């Protein structure tokens, strides 16, 4: 290294530390942090939609649908448990912190909708974000994709039974969708009551 005029201090540092964090690598981290912060401040709905779609793999709509008070209490209880808290609860608390921040900034999570929700991505709406079908616990990506393929605005589902048959999903998924109110407008079966 001395043959190519590397300073002595650098050679000694390499001998002591064995590895120095490259400046270019550090700059790349800083630039990325700056870009993320810029998006969070100037394009908040896009930031939150991207974050929840990509990072929050454990996202469960039922947690955010219960409101800000529930979210704060859940986060508080996880922190109070400390090391005793489960890994899943810690993961949920992480995305709930960001969900709470989003709500505090005046945006909201709209209701999951059978026809308007994307199967796997958060959609930007006028009020905030619309969670995907897969954000419901018990409704996996495959079931959400099957529902998206089966739905047709020109030929809406006439019943829960019709949804189950056309999408090829099980009763458990139907029950999960019904539990959170996604199927409130759909009758149980294709049969029509005359009296």
Description of each model-found segment:
Residues 1-195:
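Noncatalytic, beta-rich nucleic-acid-contacting surfaces in large DNA/RNA-processing enzymes
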């Amino acid at each position: 290294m001395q043959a190519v005029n590397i300073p002595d201090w650098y050679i000694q540092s390499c001998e002591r530390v064995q590895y120095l964090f490259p400046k270019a690598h550090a700059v790349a981290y800083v630039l990325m942090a700056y870009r993320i912060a810029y998006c969070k401040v100037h394009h908040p709905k896009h930031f939150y939609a991207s974050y929840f779609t990509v990072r929050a793999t454990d996202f469960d709509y039922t947690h955010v649908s219960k409101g800000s008070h529930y979210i704060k209490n859940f986060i508080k209880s996880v922190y109070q448990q400390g090391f005793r808290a489960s890994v899943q609860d810690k993961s949920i608390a992480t995305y709930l912190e960001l969900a709470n921040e989003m709500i505090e900034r005046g945006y909201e999570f709209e209701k999951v909708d059978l026809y308007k929700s994307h199967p796997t991505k958060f959609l930007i709406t006028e009020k905030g974000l619309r969670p995907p079908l897969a954000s419901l616990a018990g409704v996996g990506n495959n079931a959400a994709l099957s529902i998206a393929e089966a739905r047709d605005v020109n030929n809406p589902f006439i019943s829960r039974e019709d949804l189950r048959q056309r999408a090829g999903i099980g009763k458990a998924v139907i029950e999960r969708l019904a539990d959170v109110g996604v199927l409130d407008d759909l009758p149980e079966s294709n049969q029509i009551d005359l009296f």
